[in-house]
Curated annotation (Swiss-Prot):
Family note: Belongs to the CemA family.
Annotated TM spans: 239-259, 354-374, 437-457
Function statement: Required for H(+) efflux immediately after light irradiation to form a rapid H(+) concentration gradient across the thylakoid membranes. Together with PxcL, contributes to transient H(+) uptake following dark to light transition.
Protein's recorded name: Proton extrusion protein PxcA
Disulfide cross-links: none
Flavoprotein keyword on record: no
Membrane topology: Multi-pass membrane protein
Keyword terms: Cell inner membrane, Cell membrane, Hydrogen ion transport, Ion transport, Membrane, Transmembrane, Transmembrane helix, Transport
MF term (GO), any: proton transmembrane transporter activity
Amino acid sequence: MAISPWKQFKLSVLNANQWFRKTPERALNMAYDAANKIRSIEEEHFEGRKISNVSISYSNSTKSYFNSQLNRYLKIIQVRLAEFNTSISVVGTLDQNKVDKQKDKFDQNYQQEFPGRSSIILDKLEFIDQVSSRYYKSSNHEAQELNTDLEIPHSSSSIAIVSSNVNVNNYPNNVRAGSSQNQNNLAELKSNIPNTNFLPRSLLKTFKKIKQELDPEAETEVIRKFRKSQIKTLTSVRFILLVILVPLLIHQLSKITFVGYLVDNFMSLPHQQAELFLNSNMEEEALVKLHQYEEKLHFKMYLGQAPELFPELYESGKEITEIPKSEREELIEHKVEKKAQEIALEYKAKGNNGIKNIFCDFISLITFVIIISTRKRELEVLKSFMDDVVYGLSDSAKAFIIILLTDMFVGFHSPHGWEVILENITRHFGLPESRDFNFLFIATFPVILDAVFKYWIFRYLNRSSPSAVATYKNMNE
């Protein structure tokens, strides 16, 4: 008996409806099978550990095969979970009362049994999360939460977890390590991959922007990104203040407490009393200062300004000409002797201060190293913050900063600045100033620094911001 076209059409619609309603279960099963295959590879070839290149004695070809299989299964999990989430939300909103009661028995049983399978669905999703999350978590997950490359919340679903893993595992093994150097290599590799799109990038960006503006979750996403940026800024500023202020406070506290006490007591010992000056430069400065003071006394006495220097002479009502020369010289010698004692105490304190600075700076350096080593998460956040600030500048601003720094440290007038810096450093530590060392340093270090600047511009800035390099060359010319 022939079936009428209307019944054939109605049966086709029912079959299509049945196929569509089985889409969530079908997609979940495919994702579950892919997760099972990943787990099988882990147990058979990696002793139950995650698939990686660490401490596994396989050849490069074998490792490449395992990685390709891992990427394939992770991609299946990503796509099928996206299909599951989309289809389950659509199927759940359908009005069950409008479904034709005459559809086949299998479809009716499926609709009745599907709500009771929630525990099975949850078990499968939990297993998929357990397998795929191993390739999402890294050894420093907290530091990567605020990284600019990671825009996914910590409590994301399996789709977000797998998506981040696929993006990392799509590259060779030697760029999938957790260190910052490998992250830089990964970014460099991504930048070298040619992007051959049929449509222009500007048009695609416009479509993407319109899509984001029409997204009902766009406002929530903007607020989330703003809060994330705010937390990143506050964390970076707090870390900068911590790195600067804590070593300075430790330096001052140690100088006025135990370090200062120990140095002062040691330098006041009898065998140290004879050493008035820490180095020959201090002694030369003290002698010049004493000689200038003596010449000043003679000069003012000849000009009749002695009342300020010798008030005891004028209490008796005598003039300078009435005082014998030998007596005047004796008074000047007495003043010079008193001044010499003051200068000796002054330069003795300067020498002690230089020794204190050596120990206190060493303690501050240890404090700085401890802060850096114990605050790696804040250090990663600061690095991300500085990247945002630097790469957020315009090309003209970048070129201006580069020219300012190069002219300041390696430019024509930089030797005078380096000379002042070296003199202050030697005085800070109480060391003798060496003109030969200063000239040698000025002749070599700025040249090395200039070579480093040029290499950085050629190697990195020329790739990340070619327009900034062009602007820099035009401004420098």
